Amino acid sequence: YTSIKPLGDRVAEAEEKTAGGLLLTETTKEKPSIGTVIAVGPGSLDEEGKITP
């Protein structure tokens, strides 16, 4: 409804759609928690100055 205007603090969130018109659900908006490691460093130094992986 494009003719409806919110009053005061009664604001409705707009539906998020892709360019093709698909509605995005909350689960598709989450950032991925799985990735691929492509490089690693030598490690970090501990209090004694030794490198720990």
Swiss-Prot record:
It is found in: Plastid, Chloroplast. One of its GO terms (biological process) is chaperone cofactor-dependent protein refolding. SUPFAM superfamilies: GroES-like. It holds the Pfam family Cpn10. The keyword rRNA-binding does not apply. CDD domains: cpn10. GO terms for cellular component: chloroplast; mitochondrion. Residues 11-53 are annotated as: Cpn-10 domain 2. Keywords: Chaperone, Chloroplast, Plastid, Repeat. InterPro entries: Chaperonin_GroES (IPR020818), Chaperonin_GroES_sf (IPR037124), GroES-like_sf (IPR011032). GO terms for molecular function: ATP binding; metal ion binding; protein folding chaperone; protein-folding chaperone binding; unfolded protein binding. Its main location: plastid. Residues 1-10 are annotated as: Cpn-10 domain 1. The keyword Repeat applies. Seems to function only as a co-chaperone, along with cpn60, and in certain cases is essential for the discharge of biologically active proteins from cpn60. Forms stable complexes with cpn60 in the presence of ATP. Homotetramer. This is 20 kDa chaperonin. It comes from Populus euphratica (Euphrates poplar).
